[in-house]
Design a protein with these regions (language model features):
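Short pre-active-site segment immediately N-terminal to the catalytic Zn-binding motif
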Residues: 13-27
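An active-site-proximal "capping" alpha-helix that borders the catalytic cofactor pocket
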Residues: 56-70
Length: 172
């Protein structure tokens, strides 16, 4: 999550799992993208409509740019690998920059949106949008939401969540 009162006060948080530090890295790069976008807004337009963020789509594009275009690039992997090897020698000493780059760009279905690869991330967003439309149009009852969620994940990603935490409740 990234927020702040103005471009001079940008704060963000990240999650961290010692068993999977890449989730923290890419989450941090994502939130950095939000922060950099906020810090780049024209200060002379503060408190005016033209000085506000251009919308969630543009905001998200900037966070995804840092997470994926920068963070998943070969150049970044080659820069990062000595640092990973220094801090995680038992796991990373024999890994090259290209090996890291290939592994962080692997495309495969996943249950959790914020951990999804660049290709399937958009399917996670599409599924949420389709479910939202059904809810708003009265085509889906709240009580049926968990099953509808799992059905759409199976239809578009070929996977079902083993529990509600990794399924319909993951964004809470």
């Amino acid at each position: 999550f990234c927020g702040g009162a103005n471009p001079d006060d940008v704060r963000w948080t990240t999650r961290y799992d010692e068993a999977e530090p890449f989730g923290s890295l890419y989450g941090s790069l994502h939130e950095t993208g939000h922060g950099l976008y906020e810090q780049g807004r024209p200060r002379h337009l503060d408190f005016q409509p033209a000085g506000h963020a251009d919308g969630l789509g543009v905001h998200e594009s900037q966070s995804r740019l840092w997470e994926n275009q920068v963070g998943r690039s070969l150049a970044f992997s080659e820069w990062a690998i000595p640092h990973w090897a220094e801090h995680f020698p038992e796991n990373m000493n024999d890994v090259t920059g290209e090996m890291l780059w290939r592994s962080v760009n692997l495309v495969e279905p996943s249950l959790i949106r914020v951990e999804a690869d660049e290709a399937t991330y958009n399917l996670h967003i599409m599924i949420r949008y389709e479910i939202e439309k059904q809810l708003i149009n009265g085509e889906l009852d709240i009580d049926d939401l968990p099953d509808a969620w799992d059905d759409m994940y199976e239809k578009f990603l070929g996977i079902r969540s083993p529990d509600r935490k990794q399924g319909v409740l993951q964004d809470i």
